[in-house]
Amino acid sequence: MLKSPGSVRWWVAAGILLCAFVLLQTMSHGEAIVLRQPLHDLPYALGPWTGEEQPLQDRVVQVAGVSDYTNRIYSQPAETPVQLYVGYYASQRTGDTIHSPKNCLPGSGWDPIQSGYATILVPGGHNIVVNQYVIQRDQNKQLVFYWYQGRGRVIASEYKGKFWMVADAIRRNRTDGALVRVVTPMNDGEDRARIRLVGFTQTLFPSLDELIPN
């Protein structure tokens, strides 16, 4: 029986990830790379935005396996708030690996109904490409941006992220990295929500880039 192209691509991707996992487990352990500063030091005042920490439950942090994290709500007058989550992994060799929001969101009751990419011009004059999702629970919709950041790269694709993690483990003896996710309700429409997340990301990026090791 012939397999569909989509099925073949799935098995190829699964094989690559399995090989990457085996390789990382069999290689000698590299040092865990600590943040330049704890994520708690990320400014609570970002442009017009003011942040408030929203600690996660201990069991959630344990399941995530993060070395450090911050989970905040940023707000400003007369504007819909933005939720920011950054989870940092000093090493991904021992089973604690970055969990894709694409897999975690359905478990929390939010279903992805639209996906794509967004290109954002950040301070310094360069573009970053991030994942863009619209998620829905009942009649509520939210817009999500997320990306993987570390070792001098900002990556949207999970497969590229795994590739570079293995390559850097071999070349640099490093597997550190962070997941960055920003979310905002779409009660004022998708276009307005997108403008809000793009602006917030542009304001956030320089401060975040100072904390995550290159």
Q: PLM features: what roles do these ranges have?
A:
Residues M1-S7:
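Short, Lys/Arg-rich N-terminal segment immediately upstream of the first membrane anchor
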Residues H29-L46:
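Alpha-helical transmembrane signal-anchor/signal-peptide segments
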Residues A20, G47-P48, A178, Q202:
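Active-site-proximal helix/loop capping residues that flank conserved catalytic or ligand/cofactor
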Residues P43-S75:
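Short extracytoplasmic
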Residues G15-I16, L42, L197:
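Active-site-proximal structural scaffolding
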Residues W10, S28, D58-V61, P106-G107, ...:
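Intrinsically disordered, low-complexity segments enriched in polar/charged residues with Gly/Pro
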Residues T70, S75-F200, L204-I212:
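A cross-kingdom signal targeting lumenal/periplasmic-facing segments of multi-pass membrane
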